[in-house]
Amino acid sequence: MPTIQQLVRKGRRDKISKVKTAALKGSPQRRGVCTRVYTTTPKKPNSALRKVARVKLTSQVEVTAYIPGEGHNLQEHSMVLVRGGRVKDLPGVRYKIIRGSLDTQGVKNRKQARSRYGAKKEKG
């Protein structure tokens, strides 16, 4: 334990908190190009084929991003917009692709929470 005199001379160091979305470099979103689109399985106790994409961002970082919603039109070389937000049952997936922007289409036949999935309002 330091003495009062040592604290007067040096002071206490503030702890630096780790940034959860480092690849975005402080931006709310980043544009990127899909390098690989594939499915992966979640951790126990869940079971599914989760759709994910490997994306090279404009910050020159390659990340794994989750594709939310049912069905998608993404393939290699698609331009996507990526936001932060992890997927709890997929280790290493800390980003999500924003539906309805750039090359990503919105989810078809979506009635509720449409703005999250880039779905247009139905006519009538």
UniProtKB/Swiss-Prot annotation:
<dbReference type="InterPro" id="IPR005679">
    <property type="entry name" value="Ribosomal_uS12_bac"/>
</dbReference>
<keyword id="KW-0046">Antibiotic resistance</keyword>
<dbReference type="GO" id="GO:0005840">
    <property type="term" value="C:ribosome"/>
</dbReference>
<feature type="region of interest" description="Disordered">
    <location>
        <begin position="105"/>
        <end position="124"/>
    </location>
</feature>
<comment type="similarity">
    <text>Belongs to the universal ribosomal protein uS12 family.</text>
</comment>
<feature type="compositionally biased region" description="Basic residues">
    <location>
        <begin position="108"/>
        <end position="118"/>
    </location>
</feature>
<comment type="subunit">
    <text>Part of the 30S ribosomal subunit. Contacts proteins S8 and S17. May interact with IF1 in the 30S initiation complex.</text>
</comment>
<dbReference type="GO" id="GO:0006412">
    <property type="term" value="P:translation"/>
</dbReference>
<dbReference type="GO" id="GO:0003735">
    <property type="term" value="F:structural constituent of ribosome"/>
</dbReference>
<comment type="function">
    <text>With S4 and S5 plays an important role in translational accuracy.</text>
</comment>
<dbReference type="Pfam" id="PF00164">
    <property type="entry name" value="Ribosom_S12_S23"/>
</dbReference>
<keyword id="KW-0687">Ribonucleoprotein</keyword>
<protein>
    <recommendedName>
        <fullName>Small ribosomal subunit protein uS12</fullName>
    </recommendedName>
</protein>
<dbReference type="GO" id="GO:0000049">
    <property type="term" value="F:tRNA binding"/>
</dbReference>
<dbReference type="GO" id="GO:0015935">
    <property type="term" value="C:small ribosomal subunit"/>
</dbReference>
<comment type="function">
    <text>Interacts with and stabilizes bases of the 16S rRNA that are involved in tRNA selection in the A site and with the mRNA backbone. Located at the interface of the 30S and 50S subunits, it traverses the body of the 30S subunit contacting proteins on the other side and probably holding the rRNA structure together. The combined cluster of proteins S8, S12 and S17 appears to hold together the shoulder and platform of the 30S subunit.</text>
</comment>
<dbReference type="InterPro" id="IPR012340">
    <property type="entry name" value="NA-bd_OB-fold"/>
</dbReference>
<dbReference type="GO" id="GO:0046677">
    <property type="term" value="P:response to antibiotic"/>
</dbReference>
<keyword id="KW-0699">rRNA-binding</keyword>
<keyword id="KW-0694">RNA-binding</keyword>
<keyword id="KW-0689">Ribosomal protein</keyword>
<dbReference type="GO" id="GO:0019843">
    <property type="term" value="F:rRNA binding"/>
</dbReference>
<dbReference type="InterPro" id="IPR006032">
    <property type="entry name" value="Ribosomal_uS12"/>
</dbReference>
<keyword id="KW-0820">tRNA-binding</keyword>
